[in-house]
């Protein structure tokens, strides 16, 4: 029989694992509706006065209609996270709707704070993610299919059909964050030096400047 000390050590190790694997900190009360206008800076958002909480803090119609896809990539992500549903604060979940024009692409990106699971509403998609061993895991999806993207790994979705497509994406974080590789590397403020990118991608500074012109920082 294991000693009490060993049993306690194993228990603490198990508990520590589950705590550390949680995408967001656990909630400590029934609800903590985000007080978004507050100037207080914490890891997350402070709670608004419980007496002022209403059902509107937990409600959104933002995913009901398709998003406009008339942009460079032919895709649009509409978020339903703590920024649009403040009642999600501390709950550790959020959703997005992604709409794709025919041939539209949600370009390679990562979610540093969450795992993502997509459910295909309409259309067909080619999706995939890359492991840290540079292995591509890819799949073709159709209406009703589900696919998971592990937390922090680079992934993408492309509409491979000639009709619009859409998915609902679920995340185990109230605010998963998104880093699009192209915009991050070539459209940052201040910019990453041309010589750094040229050496990293084994190309010329002139080519880097040309690519940067496609990713002008937002003003």
Curated annotation (Swiss-Prot):
Q: List residues traversing the bilayer.
A: none
What Gene Ontology molecular function terms does this protein carry?
manganese ion binding
GO CC term, one of those recorded = plasmodesma
Note the PROSITE patterns from the entry. Answer: GERMIN
- Attached carbohydrates are found at 70
> Per the annotation, which location comes first and is thus the protein's main one?
secreted
Q: Which Gene3D superfamilies match?
A: Jelly Rolls
* Keyword Secreted in annotation: yes
Q: Which residues form the signal peptide?
A: 1-21
What keywords appear on the UniProt entry? Apoplast, Disulfide bond, Glycoprotein, Manganese, Metal-binding, Secreted, Signal
The UniProt annotation places Mn(2+) binding at 109, 111, 116, 155
- Which PANTHER family would you find in this protein's record? GERMIN-LIKE PROTEIN SUBFAMILY 3 MEMBER 3
Kindly state the subunit structure of this protein.
Oligomer (believed to be a pentamer but probably hexamer).
User: Hey, which family's this protein in?
Assistant: Belongs to the germin family.
Name used for this protein in its record: Germin-like protein subfamily 2 member 1
């Amino acid at each position: 029989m294991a000693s009490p000390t060993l049993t306690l050590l194993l228990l603490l190790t198990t508990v520590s694992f589950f705590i550390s694997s949680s995408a967001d900190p656990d909630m400590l009360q029934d609800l903590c509706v985000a007080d978004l206008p507050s100037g207080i800076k914490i890891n997350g958002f402070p709670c608004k006065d419980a007496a002022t909480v209403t059902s509107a803090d937990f409600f959104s119609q933002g995913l009901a209609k398709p998003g406009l896809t008339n942009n460079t990539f032919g895709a649009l992500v509409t978020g339903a996270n703590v920024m649009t549903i403040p009642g999600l604060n501390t709950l550790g979940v959020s959703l997005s709707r992604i709409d794709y024009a025919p041939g539209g692409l949600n370009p390679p990106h990562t979610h540093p704070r969450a795992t993502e699971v997509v459910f295909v509403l309409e259309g067909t998609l080619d999706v995939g993610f890359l492991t840290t061993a540079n292995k591509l895991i890819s799949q073709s999806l159709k209406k009703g299919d589900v696919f998971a993207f592990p937390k922090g790994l680079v992934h993408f979705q492309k509409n491979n059909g000639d009709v619009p497509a859409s998915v609902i994406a679920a995340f185990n974080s109230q605010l998963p964050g998104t880093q699009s590789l192209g915009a991050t590397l070539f459209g940052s403020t201040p910019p990453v030096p041309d010589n750094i990118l040229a050496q990293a991608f084994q190309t010329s500074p002139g080519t880097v400047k040309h690519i940067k012109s496609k990713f002008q920082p937002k003003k």
